[in-house]
């Protein structure tokens, strides 16, 4: 989390604040945590100079009112193993609580191939409980824990040692307030019967495919207006080489070359170093050595791609015949449903999903699971002319036709 607590200069650091630096200390904490219904977790990491995130600090807290049950874990300590933590992740009697868990979970999955079970993400839960879309930790701390966090605090290089007492207090705040937030949201979900909704949403966070980028599929993330299969074949090979190169050397893929360079190279089709040096968008480091050779090889592979193996763009939704009037009605219905349920509208259906439904598609997220209950069923009835919408003051009323 990037938001930190403002600490008055006169405040003394709690003597109970612990930093664990050995495997045995972590094991002892995790053994104690297994006696409790939940544990809150957060991480501090760096990713500016690497492909994979570098874990720099781990924060853990058991239920409690103060910092006595919260600890910091220093993963940079020599010889420290996170195996006890991963054993705790596998203990299904203890809920593992995060806020905006995706990047945290990616770190653990890459390191050990394990996911916390069961998982609770307060950001997802907050969207279901009426706190808006992608609500930030600072907002939940203010609204639920009734505390104030400092949004203007600067980012910290968490890889540097030793950590200051102020940094430690900052980090602990990410898990101590999270306890209050979790208990509050879990109570709302239980009362409203929406716990299952959150569980459905969290399935994508515990799906390995969420965190694995296959080099062969990297081209699908490159935005280009040219949909020619021959052009896309070169895009595919260039994106594949970049992903493989970045992964093998653990460097950001943008330091190899950027997406706009892929688009340019796929258009200019360089055959040799002289051609490569004419590129306007290619970084200097990419014009020589292994990267340059990889680019030339990738371009040639794309040019030589057999007709049967050429990539085909997914133009399914682009060719849809969208009924604009029906699409507008679906937006009105969605706004009405989100107003009634308190669920963030984007969590139920995106604009693209609404257009797809208006064009006759039914295999969209809004037509599955809890979304179908909240919105999908009435959306279908609206499309089929079974219901209409009527204004009633500031509200929208559904009427049967």
What are these regions (language model features)?
Residues 19, 59-179, 186, 205-206:
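Active-site-proximal helix-loop-helix substrate-binding element of RNase H-like nuclease domains
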Residues 165, 185-401:
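Accessory DNA-binding and partner-docking regions appended to nucleic-acid-acting proteins
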Residues 5-39, 43:
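N-terminal accessory regions of nucleic-acid-interacting proteins
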Residues 35-36, 41-52, 79-83, 91:
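An N-terminal domain-cap segment
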Residues 47, 56-59:
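Residues that scaffold, gate, or flank divalent-cation-dependent active/transport sites
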Residues 46, 124-128, 260-264:
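Conserved short loop/turn motifs at secondary-structure junctions
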Residues 50-54, 72-74:
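Short, glycine/acidic-enriched capping/hinge loops at junctions between secondary-structure elements
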């Amino acid at each position: 989390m990037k938001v930190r607590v403002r600490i008055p200069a006169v405040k003394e650091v709690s003597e109970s604040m612990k930093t664990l630096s050995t495997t045995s200390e972590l094991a002892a904490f995790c053994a104690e945590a297994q006696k409790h219904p939940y544990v809150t977790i957060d991480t501090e990491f760096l990713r500016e100079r690497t492909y994979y995130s570098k874990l720099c600090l781990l924060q853990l807290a058991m239920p409690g009112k103060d910092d006595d049950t919260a600890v910091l874990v220093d993963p940079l300590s020599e010889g420290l193993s996170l195996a006890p933590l991963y054993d705790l992740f596998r203990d299904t009697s203890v809920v593992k609580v995060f806020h905006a868990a995706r990047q945290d979970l990616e770190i653990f999955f890459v390191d050990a191939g394990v996911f916390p079970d069961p998982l609770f993400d307060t950001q997802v839960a907050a969207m279901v409980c009426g706190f808006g879309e992608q609500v930030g930790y600072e907002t939940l701390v203010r609204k639920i824990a009734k505390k104030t966090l400092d949004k203007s605090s600067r980012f910290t290089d968490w890889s540097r040692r030793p950590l200051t007492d102020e940094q430690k207090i900052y980090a602990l705040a990410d898990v101590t307030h999270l306890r209050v937030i979790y208990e509050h949201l879990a109570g709302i979900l239980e009362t409203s019967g929406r716990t299952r909704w959150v569980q459905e949403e969290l399935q994508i966070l515990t799906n390995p495919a969420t965190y694995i980028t296959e080099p062969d599929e990297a081209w699908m993330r490159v935005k280009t207006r040219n949909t020619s299969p021959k052009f896309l074949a070169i895009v595919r090979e260039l994106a594949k080489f970049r992903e493989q190169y970045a992964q093998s050397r653990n460097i950001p893929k943008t330091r190899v070359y950027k997406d706009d360079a892929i688009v340019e190279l796929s258009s200019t089709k360089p055959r040799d170093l002289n051609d490569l040096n004419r590129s306007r968008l290619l970084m200097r480091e990419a014009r020589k050595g292994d990267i340059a050779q990889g680019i030339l090889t990738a371009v040639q592979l794309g040019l030589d791609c057999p007709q049967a193996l050429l990539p085909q763009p997914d133009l399914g939704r682009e060719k849809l015949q969208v009924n604009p009037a029906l699409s507008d009605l679906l937006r009105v219905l969605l706004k009405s449903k989100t107003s009634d349920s308190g669920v963030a509208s984007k969590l139920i259906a995106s604009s693209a999903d609404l257009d797809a439904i208006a064009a006759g598609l039914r295999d969209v997220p809004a037509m599955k699971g809890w979304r179908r209950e909240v919105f999908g069923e009435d959306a279908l009835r609206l499309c089929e002319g079974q219901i209409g919408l009527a204004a009633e003051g500031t509200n929208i009323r559904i009427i049967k036709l």
